[in-house]
Amino acid sequence: MNKTPTTLIIMDGFGLRTETEGNAVAAANTPRLDQFFQEYAHTDLSASGLDVGLPAGQMGNSEVGHTNIGAGRVVFQDLPRISKSIDDGDFFQNPAYVHAMDACKEKRSALHLMGLLSDGGVHSHIDHLFALMQMAKDRGLERVYIHAFLDGRDVSPTSGVDYVTRTVEKCRELGVGKIATLMGRYYAMDRDKRWDRVEAAYDAMVYGESAHVNPLPVAAVKDAYAAGVTDEFIEPVICDGDGTISDNDSVIFFNYRPDRAREITRTLVDPKFDGFTRQYFPVTFVCTTEYDATMPNVEVAYPRQAVRNGLGEYLSNLGLTQLRIAETEKYAHVTFFFNGGVETQFPGEDRVLVPSPKVATYDLQPEMSAYEVCDKCVERIESGAYDVIILNFANCDMVGHTGVFDAAVKAVETVDECVGKVVDATMKMGGIAMITADHGNAETMTQEDGSPMTAHTTDLVPFILCGAGSELRQGRLADIAPTILDVMGLAAPEEMDGQTLIVK
């Protein structure tokens, strides 16, 4: 007997904004979404700041969004958790950090601090680096090297020079630390097994090898700008040849978001890594959060706080079936993050991964793999095998990050077409479809001065309920899971403090 599906469609990076200037969502031709807004109950959801467990005014992101959606409650995020520990002093006694620094003194080795130099708050925060530098000084360390990854994606594309300047000044102020290497996140923070990029980052940090050498970090960034290269894409630069990562050194990776921290970490800690040829050697390595439960030879400074009875676990315990489907760029979000940071696949949970296209930047192929994701999802819906389907279309976010307006418009139009097909298939099976987003992006493609805007936004996101409910209230992402359970006639578990969006 065929199941009646409840399908949740997450349009990654699709926010709501009334102004049309630089708004790829408004500029796009979206006949299907226009139809759904016209025909079905809809509302707006908060996807940023305190409503998703971030500091007030902090833009949302995909990890946080999917975590809150899957949990059915507001989940306190790593950024405020770590920042609070700095404020109350616990940070400076963190056992993992203490061990890494003490190991340097015992072995007379160097401490390396690596991570994204940014205050965008998505993957890292520069204040956490500065706290580690202060801690290193307090513990009497002298050889402290910084491997700076430049952002340009969650913040302005040419803001890197400011962060590098601040870091150089902080080194001077404390009398501790030197920038050994700097590079765009394009190289150091890949998540799609583009090992040529990761190898370039590794070679710079471990071997001190790169075509670019400049002992002046600020000048190195300015040189890149002069050549037309923005922060994200700056090729690795060697700033201090003595600052290579060597045997028995300690490394602290201060990024707290796992997905883009895994690959470069594995090159340094996993003897079985085979993405490219390199020599393994022992280091004391600290991941600020748990990047991967299978990661060997690491300590974790801030272990993940368990999310009990999230939507996936709850459905599984009830004996219901569920499908998670996305392309590579967002696969971790509909699985790992949606499940509250649990690597385990729950009984009754199937997963479909569609490879993302191998292009340098997604403005070159704004359709990405959406059509294949759509076709595979429709096929699974028509199979009648699933009670719940969780689907992510990556386009609006990934193409939005490029800052290329016309490509973002095409991305929105692609998503519109695919969402229409998935909703049609769901309704044909007698099911209910929900359309939403995890955060904003494509609705704001330009900054006030007209330059490209590549970061997320704090805008509200849509929620459309196709096939049930005549009136919806405003809410937040944590209310989606209770709404799914509501339309399925199921009580929400007591751990979920989100509330159904349906007005009774």
Where is each model-derived feature located?
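Feature captures the catalytic ectodomains and active-site-proximal regions of enzymes
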Residues: 1-504
